[in-house]
Amino acid sequence: MEFVMFEDVQGQEIYVNPEQVVWVRELGDKRTIISCGHDHTFTVRLSPAQAVAALGVKVR
């Protein structure tokens, strides 16, 4: 299992399994929400493109 580390907007480290990411959405102001399911969302200080690139996922 592989994990990618992010820092959320509160400065806490978040480790995400890229295979569990459901969606990535721009919040504005260079912030992005990453969802790993029902109640598992967090906000990072990255653009959506940067977050997806960090996850190593191809975009179509």
Residue ranges and their predicted role:
Residues 1-15, 19-60:
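Acidic, Ser/Thr- and proline-rich intrinsically disordered linker/docking segments
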